[in-house]
Amino acid sequence: MTNKHTKDVALVLASGGPRGFAYIGAIEELEARGYNITSVTGCSIGSLVGGIYAAGGLQDFKEWLFQLNNYKLLGLLDISLSKSYLVKGEKVINAIKNIVPDVNIEDLRIPYRAVATDLYTGEQVVFKSGKLFEAIRSSISIPSMFRPVRMGNHTMVDGGILNTVPMDIAVRNGHDLLVTFDVNQIDSDKIAASLAAYHEAKDKYSDSKLDIKGVLEQLPAKKEKSLLEMAKWVGDETHKLILKDREAHQKVKEIDKKAEEANMPFVEDDNYYSILSRSFSLMLSTVARLQLQLFKPDILVKMNFDSYGNITAYTKSTEISDKGRALLSKALDEYEKSL
């Protein structure tokens, strides 16, 4: 039974791509406020951040991660020619292992659990022993993105397919707080309203065209004017159209910029990555919502999955970590006030 005044925390970190860098700041906030993380359970990116924390390498990992730029990120992608997946996934794992040495899960300083999905049997695979980075690599294997991991009779892909927020396998000590961080929330009503407003505003200006033909068609009505006057009139009207067209293009850019700053998903082009990523995120959001109806953590921290949804978010780890810390701090404030 949970002791409401305990400082012990069983931490559960959900699947969620680059949004999971929020867990770095969240862990730092927990420790700064005197909480004692007694176990960590993670799925996909949650298994990565949680595993590195359990191995005592979070600070070194953070320093490496926070200096990544687009160029360095590309250098970590071992692109594959396979028709089944885009990235082999070994380069990035090896780069992290150079910073945080591999270790057996049973030798970690606190209990750790990671979850993957058996692609063929549909069963959940829970890692509680064996090599840490084998567990992490299995858990992060997003279908079509990373090469599946074969271990024994298992062919493993991302654990989020079955268990996005693995609260059910968390290691508890009988009096700890279950603290869950889910980065897969979606506000459908807000997105629908924003989508309607976005297209209404964009259509208003996108219809603007440089209609020189329309100006020329008005010339017969100006036949009483001299040739010089007509030429001047055409020039003036054309100039007005050009200014109007420039204004329209600028407005469209401003609308796109505001939507991007608000992390609205419809600003992105419908490319292979964005469609795959969003489809997978929608699945994670659905699974997470159902799990949170079944399991009630003592403290739940939530982040919208549109917060950092595209591939460039992997170079925004500092910003994401700071946001995670702020969200965790707010959740702790609310919990402590309720005591």
Outline where the language-model segments fall.
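Patatin-like phospholipase
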Residues: 1-43, 51-339
